[in-house]
Amino acid sequence: NIYTLKYEGKLKPSSELKLHCQIYKTKPEIGAVIHTHQMFGSIVAAAQVDVQVLDENHQNILGGKVIKAAPYALPNTKKITMATAKAIENSNAALMSNHGVVCIGKDLEHVFDVARTLEKACELFIESKKAIA
């Protein structure tokens, strides 16, 4: 239950349960949330910068031209939960500074597509920064 944080069954929910529930509350139209530690997404998250999405197809899948980085906060805290929910307000993904990424979608297939696309967008973003350095 996203309001009481109570669950049924034998499997224990993720330690980021509050984060997942807050995103579902904030964006009731979605059907799936995933939190990953994918390589390029985590690199950009460690840099604590927003990702400029350079490819138009990536922009369509990610729901915007910029993927926001939530300010750093300790994992499993209200601060990181609220900061990440705010960072994902206008797109289908957000970076969790020094931690990883969160992606949302209408269903699991869609959210995995968002995660794959975010990884490609982060790789392109890193390459673009290297090219001008």
Q: What function would you assign to each model-found segment?
A:
Residues 1-133:
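Glycine-rich flexible loops
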